[in-house]
């Protein structure tokens, strides 16, 4: 079999250890295969790099095992050609002998060019991804915390959400603070309304008539404090993301994406961070949508094509595009809104959102 890399190595990565197998030419012909085990502490990983460097290894392959591959990749990527491989791909490559350990098998597959490398973005893009994904998790946690506030109010029979569109708006927040402080007079609470909400004073007085207990006040206090803390962290992260985006990509790209129905600046940032600038790795815009997990599987049998479950993809990009699709579905002045409503009536909102998200994925890739 043709040899692609004469000096290469395979790494079997675990939480506490890394088993490495390096393959180099033997002076008498054939190949020398050496196996060593290293701990995953930084000094041991540096020893691993020295060991590979001593034999002039040029390329290394390893499986994408959890998050354990990341420290190794960060340490080795500057000096070696590192190939990160999906474990499922290695599993289904035929020809493995039962007495060959994982590291040696990975090294042999790499030596003959039989591994398909996963795409790993540059470190700047990886940093952006980490920050944006954490910001998304904080936003989701804030939503859960707001729902907990609603649950406490319902338990106390305070129907503020039936009158105020935003319970945590300026008026709603002041009312909640007074409830926490012990104020239970609905007339006094309703007078805290501002703006257009003052037109609903009578409704507010009825909605704010409930039965607040000490436990309700304590829970509301803790929930609001948590929401304030989350808001501060989200604001801080957003400012840091804006700073990191300046060298990563021009602001015009965000503006172009922001012009697409359903896409706001936050979603545009997620799309750029997940897809990156190297769009040439996608032959077509449809390939990018498929990478996001927005293309249905297709099986052909007896000359007939059958759709199957949507393939797994980048869940963070998919979530952002589906969120944009739901927003686009509310548009009355765009064909995507009409498409969403038509599909939702026949097949449900979730399937409609997936279909529109696919359209958005194709559009966003095409304008890059």
What are these regions (language model features)?
Residues 1-368:
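A detector of single, family-specific signature residues
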């Amino acid at each position: 079999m043709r040899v692609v890399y004469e000096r290469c190595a395979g790494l079997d990565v675990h939480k506490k250890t890394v088993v490495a197998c390096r393959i180099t030419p033997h002076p008498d012909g054939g190949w020398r295969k050496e196996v060593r085990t290293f701990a995953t502490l930084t000094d041991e990983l540096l020893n691993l790099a020295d060991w590979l460097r001593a034999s002039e290894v040029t390329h290394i392959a390893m499986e994408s095992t959890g998050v354990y591959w990341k420290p190794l990749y960060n340490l080795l990527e500057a000096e070696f050609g590192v190939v990160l491989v999906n474990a499922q791909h290695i599993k289904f490559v035929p020809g493995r002998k039962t007495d060959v350990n994982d590291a040696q098998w990975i090294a042999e597959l790499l030596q003959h060019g039989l591994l398909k490398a996963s795409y790993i973005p540059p470190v700047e893009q990886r940093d952006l991804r980490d920050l944006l994904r954490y910001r998304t998790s904080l936003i989701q946690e804030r939503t859960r915390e707001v729902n907990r506030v609603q649950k406490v109010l319902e338990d106390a029979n305070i129907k503020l959400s039936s009158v105020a569109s935003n319970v945590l708006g300026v008026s709603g927040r002041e009312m909640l603070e007074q409830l926490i402080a012990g104020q239970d007079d609905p007339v006094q609470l309703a007078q805290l309304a501002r703006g257009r909400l003052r037109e609903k004073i009578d409704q507010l007085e009825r909605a704010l008539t409930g039965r607040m207990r000490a436990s309700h006040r304590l829970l509301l206090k803790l929930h609001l404090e948590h929401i304030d803390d989350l808001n501060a962290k989200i604001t801080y992260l957003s400012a840091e993301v804006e700073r990191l985006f300046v060298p990563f990509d021009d602001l015009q790209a965000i503006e172009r994406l922001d012009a697409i129905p359903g896409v706001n600046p936050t979603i545009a940032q997620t799309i750029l961070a997940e897809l990156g600038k190297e769009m040439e790795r996608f032959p077509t815009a449809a390939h990018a949508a498929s990478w996001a997990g927005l293309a249905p599987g297709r099986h052909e049998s007896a000359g007939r094509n059958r759709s199957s479950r949507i393939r797994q993809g980048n869940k963070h990009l998919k979530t952002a595009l589906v969120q944009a699709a739901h927003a686009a579905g509310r548009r009355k002045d765009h064909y995507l809104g009409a498409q969403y409503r038509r599909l939702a009536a026949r097949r449900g909102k979730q399937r409609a959102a997936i279909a529109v998200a696919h359209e958005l994925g194709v559009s966003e890739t095409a304008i890059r």
